[in-house]
Amino acid sequence: MRKIIGFRIGRRVSRWIFRKTRIQRSGYNRIHSTQQACMLMRPLAKLKSWGQRLKQSFRRRSTRRSAYIPVDHKKADPVPRGHLAIYVGQKDGDCHRVLVPIVYFNHPLFGELLREAEKEYGFCHEGGITIPCLYSDFERVKTRIASGSSSRVFPWGRHCRN
């Protein structure tokens, strides 16, 4: 007979699963113990745990990020603690990424900007928070919040959209 060439992993796995384990006990071993039933189930339990470990290792490998970064791709700076990255700009215009302290979100002026964003995009908006106004208008609101002014009316009018 010709020897089959190929993987021997099937034979190795079956030997590992069905190998007999010896329990070293001092003293008397019962003939009809419940441990014999456990020994019969052990190969299946071994196979199950081996499959679970194999699945976990594949998941870990698939969730790792690739080290490849395209040449023209610029990685975004990480957001510092206590800040949130938002995008300022019109839908069709150029959006700017701005880091805003989280404390600003409680301010009434910023609340008005968020209400405008809700009217424009709604709650089911994919991506980050986008404020639909000009970048210069947003900078004015940001400086007013930083200076401590709590006026609810915009100096340039009610709407910050074009």
Swiss-Prot record:
Entry's Gene Ontology BP terms: auxin-activated signaling pathway; positive regulation of leaf senescence; regulation of seed germination
Tissue specificity as recorded in UniProt: Expressed in embryo, endosperm, growing hypocotyls and shoot apical meristems.
Source taxon at top rank: Eukaryota
GO cellular component: nucleus
Cited InterPro entries: SAUR_fam
Keywords: Auxin signaling pathway, Developmental protein, Growth regulation
Family: Belongs to the ARG7 family.
Name of the protein: Auxin-responsive protein SAUR36
Species for this entry: Arabidopsis thaliana
Lineage: Eukaryota, Viridiplantae, Streptophyta, Embryophyta, Tracheophyta
Gene of this entry: SAUR36
